[in-house]
């Protein structure tokens, strides 16, 4: 299979034609090999318009969803970004191509170790990965806050205040919010006066966020 050709087709037909216009996001997805982040047996499906299982009851998100969430973060290349839920590491790699520094947290150790290996193979050394497998631990990376952008790759019942507290002024948080079966993408922006501006985007379905801020 020609992965380069499949990746180009993915960007053109699944992402650009559905309204993603940020050239930097499109370029990052064109250059990032999604197939190395999926199980070897599923490599041929890596550029399909769907999420795929990556083990440990977790999934790699649909390419369009990755592109949309990334575009909503409005990254320029100077940001410090927090990712909750490293998963396969694919979303992390896209962020690393678009931001100055990425801090990513994963609760499932085998996933985190596989993701780290993939990220290192791409020489993405601006990624700091933490394994936080304690159920009672607070969400986020408080000692490195504030963050210019925060992305959550699991569905939550509400926007966790502990994350909005870690946003810098003008910082953006993108998170799926809803119930365990269906959510909507929510974008939060922290304004100069400390208030939070909320907008809602498309419906989506993510694995549930686990812990005190989830289920």
Curated annotation (Swiss-Prot):
Top EC group: transferase
Keywords tagged on the record: Cytoplasm, Methyltransferase, S-adenosyl-L-methionine, Transferase
GO biological process, one term: methylation
Family annotation (Gene3D superfamilies): Vaccinia Virus protein VP39
Catalytic residues in the record: 61
Reaction catalyzed: [protein]-L-isoaspartate + S-adenosyl-L-methionine = [protein]-L-isoaspartate alpha-methyl ester + S-adenosyl-L-homocysteine
GO cellular component terms given for this protein: cytoplasm
UniProt GO molecular function: protein-L-isoaspartate (D-aspartate) O-methyltransferase activity
Family matches, as InterPro entries: PCMT, SAM-dependent_MTases_sf
Main location (coarse class): cytoplasm
Assigned EC number: 2.1.1.77
Keyword flag Methyltransferase: yes
Localisation per UniProt entry: Cytoplasm
One Pfam assignment: PCMT
Functional summary from the UniProt entry: Catalyzes the methyl esterification of L-isoaspartyl residues in peptides and proteins that result from spontaneous decomposition of normal L-aspartyl and L-asparaginyl residues. It plays a role in the repair and/or degradation of damaged proteins.
Family, as annotated: Belongs to the methyltransferase superfamily. L-isoaspartyl/D-aspartyl protein methyltransferase family.
Protein name: Protein-L-isoaspartate O-methyltransferase 1
Record organism: Pelobacter propionicus (strain DSM 2379 / NBRC 103807 / OttBd1)
Gene name per UniProt: pcm1
């Amino acid at each position: 299979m020609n992965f380069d050709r499949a990746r180009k087709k993915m960007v053109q037909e699944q992402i650009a034609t559905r309204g993603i216009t940020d050239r930097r996001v499109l370029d990052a997805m064109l250059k990032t090999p999604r197939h190395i982040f999926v199980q070897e047996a599923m490599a041929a499906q890596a550029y399909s318009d769907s999420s795929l299982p990556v083990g440990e009851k977790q999934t790699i998100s649909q390419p369009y969803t990755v592109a949309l969430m990334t575009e909503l973060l409005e990254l320029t290349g100077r940001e410090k970004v927090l990712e909750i839920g490293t998963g396969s590491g694919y979303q992390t790699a896209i962020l690393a191509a678009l931001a100055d520094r990425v801090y990513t947290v994963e609760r499932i150790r085998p996933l985190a170790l596989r993701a780290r290996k993939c990220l290192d193979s791409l020489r993405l050394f601006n990624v700091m990965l933490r394994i936080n497998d304690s159920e009672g631990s607070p969400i986020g990376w408080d000692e490195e806050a504030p963050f210019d952008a925060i992305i959550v790759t699991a569905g939550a019942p509400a926007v966790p205040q502990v994350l909005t507290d870690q946003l810098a002024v003008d910082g953006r948080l993108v998170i799926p919010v809803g119930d365990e079966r269906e959510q909507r993408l929510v974008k939060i922006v922290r304004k100069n006066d400390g208030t939070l501006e909320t907008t809602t985007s498309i419906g989506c379905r993510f694995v549930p966020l686990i812990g005190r801020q989830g289920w």
